[in-house]
Amino acid sequence: MSEQEKVEQEEISAELETQNEQEKPMEETEIQDGDALENAIARVQELEEQLIQAVKKEQDILLRTRAEIDNIRRRAEQDVEKAHKFALEKFAKDLLETIDNLERALSTPANVENETIKSLVDGVELTLKGLLSTVARFGVEPVGVIGETFNPELHQAISMQPTEGFESNQITVVLQKGYLLNGRVIRPAMVMVAQ
């Protein structure tokens, strides 16, 4: 081999070595860039998953909050409705004494031949009738009728006695009428029941 060939070969070798050295850092950089890219993709996927979980959690909280608000609104409406229905309860209970007194006055035998007494009795009857119709408009209704079946939710039994013409558990005597206000008992009827 000639000197010139040797020099050329050395130049080629040197050039190859330089090229190899330049390629090595590029490969390392590519490898490092590849690792960084994979890490970045993994991190993005992890953050996306966290975001999805956070959105689901917030949607769940939103649904629960809406349901709670609906429940509160419904309870408030029911409370207002009950307040409207039963605001008159104390007043109605106080009126029951007046109704009882008027009924007792009418049940007392009176000499209706005297015109003054007859007109007084008629006035009491009209007053009672007007009072009963007025309280009925506000949801007050009487309970406790002779012959009705005894109901412990509506009636209070004072005594039980055998009575002809009545079946067992039928009301034979009403000592004091009971009353309901919009379906709720404000005073049970005091009754005697057949055995």
Swiss-Prot record:
Q: Extract the PROSITE patterns matched here.
A: GRPE
Question: Is Transcription given among the entry's keywords?
Answer: no
**Broad class of the protein's primary localization:** cytoplasm
Biased composition annotated in UniProt, kind: Acidic residues: 10-20
**InterPro entries attached to this UniProt entry:** GrpE, GrpE_coiled_coil, GrpE_head
One GO term (biological process): protein folding
Name its cellular compartments. Answer: Cytoplasm
- GO-annotated molecular function: adenyl-nucleotide exchange factor activity; protein homodimerization activity; protein-folding chaperone binding; unfolded protein binding
User: CDD domains, per this entry?
Assistant: GrpE (cd00446)
A single Gene Ontology CC term: cytosol
A UniProt-annotated Pfam family: GrpE
Q: Which UniProt keywords apply?
A: Chaperone, Cytoplasm, Stress response
Residue ranges of the region described as Disordered: 1-30
Cytoplasm listed as a keyword: yes
Superkingdom, taxonomy of origin: Bacteria
**SUBUNIT field:** Homodimer.
Physiological role: Participates actively in the response to hyperosmotic and heat shock by preventing the aggregation of stress-denatured proteins, in association with DnaK and GrpE. It is the nucleotide exchange factor for DnaK and may function as a thermosensor. Unfolded proteins bind initially to DnaJ; upon interaction with the DnaJ-bound protein, DnaK hydrolyzes its bound ATP, resulting in the formation of a stable complex. GrpE releases ADP from DnaK; ATP binding to DnaK triggers the release of the substrate protein, thus completing the reaction cycle.
Per its UniProt record, what PANTHER family does this chain match? GRPE PROTEIN (PTHR21237), GRPE PROTEIN HOMOLOG, MITOCHONDRIAL (PTHR21237:SF23)
Q: Which family does it belong to?
A: Belongs to the GrpE family.
NCBIfam families (alphabetical) = PRK14140.1, PRK14150.1
Name of the protein in question: Protein GrpE
- Origin species: Histophilus somni (strain 2336) (Haemophilus somnus)
Source taxonomy: Bacteria, Pseudomonadati, Pseudomonadota, Gammaproteobacteria, Pasteurellales
